[in-house]
Amino acid sequence: MARSFSQLAINAEKQRTSLAVSKKPTDQPELEIHTLGNSALRQSAKRISKVDKNIRDLVKKMLHSMYAAKGIGLAAPQIGSQQQLLVIDLDIENSATPPIILINPEITEFSATIDTYEEGCLSIPGVYLDVIRPSSIKVNFRDEMGRPKKINADGLLARCIQHEMDHLNGVLFVDRAINEEALNKELKEHGFKKKDVLRLCSD
């Protein structure tokens, strides 16, 4: 996955944000992260019409909460805000690498090649399952100042963006898990209910 981290470093430098916050984990997330079974995770997020101080304040709180939970990505619906907003940082141990903020993201192109990789989610803690996704994507979005941006992402960055964008449509990674037997085992082991999963693929 070295290539994806290299791509992240290049893209992050281009998308450098003024909203970078301390990456040092705190004992308590600033915002509650909803977990599987909460209806907020199944709602569709709305486009943000105005990028203002309120949005930037929300971004900071999301970043603090993501770092507190030791995650690499967080979508606004996960904290109960139905807005098209993502924060991503694949290198949370490196204070010099800035996070990426994506507002109203749109994937304009998917690669024909696909990869299978294990995913997890702050909204389904402890559960890890294989998911198939396109290996690279092109994304249009706006940054925290409302400026239009583009990213050509591959590897882990592409997967993370797709995972977080699913949240904007009320979709969770467990819905896409390719092995139902493994899904059932993981859910039971970590105290989640199968009825809260909306299967989008079959074995």
From Swiss-Prot:
It is an enzyme of class 3 (hydrolase). NCBIfam families: pept_deformyl, PRK00150.1-3. Its cofactor is Fe(2+). Keywords: Hydrolase, Iron, Metal-binding, Protein biosynthesis. The gene is def. Fe cation binds at C121, H163, H167. The active site is at E164. Its EC number is 3.5.1.88. This is Peptide deformylase. It comes from Prochlorococcus marinus (strain SARG / CCMP1375 / SS120).
